Amino acid sequence: LSSLAGDCFVIHEAVQGDYGAQRPDGFVHYTAGAWPIGPAEVTAFSAGPLPDIGLPQARIVTGDAFVECPDHSLRLRDGLAGDLVDMETGAVAQVATRLGLPWSAIKATTDDANGESVSDFDANLLVASFRAAQAAEQAIRLM
């Protein structure tokens, strides 16, 4: 899924991967919440700091579609300098930023955004949830 090793990450930045403008020469990304016209620019939503809990940091690309295609995952990650893709983090980051609230995220992966994603998600959801909860508890203890 990415060049980062592991299955649980501290998210340091989030971008929306499906917000922008569809043009004749392809899709153009914009910062979520900005008008999708004029020169394209994507500014990541920066997470607040978490204590060091020994997890790698990642930039996540969020979209509204469940990704079951490794080529699409790669296009999103390469096009937006992301390490991971998901459906939640960027939306939370955007709303928090709009409201002037700090946000932080820990992401445990459930699948590799490929043809096996549906069965992988079902099989791995409980383990990933537990892993993320453990990491969050550790971070809170260190705050």
Where are the regions that the model predicts?
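Mid-sequence, gly/pro-rich, charge-dense loop/helix-turn segments that line enzyme active sites
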Residues: 1-80
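Generic structural signal for well-ordered, non-membrane alpha-helical segments
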Residues: 41-43, 69, 85, 89, ...
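Alpha-helical scaffold segments in soluble metabolic enzymes
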Residues: 59, 75, 91, 131-138
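A C-terminal functional module that forms or caps the active site or interfaces directly
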Residues: 66-118
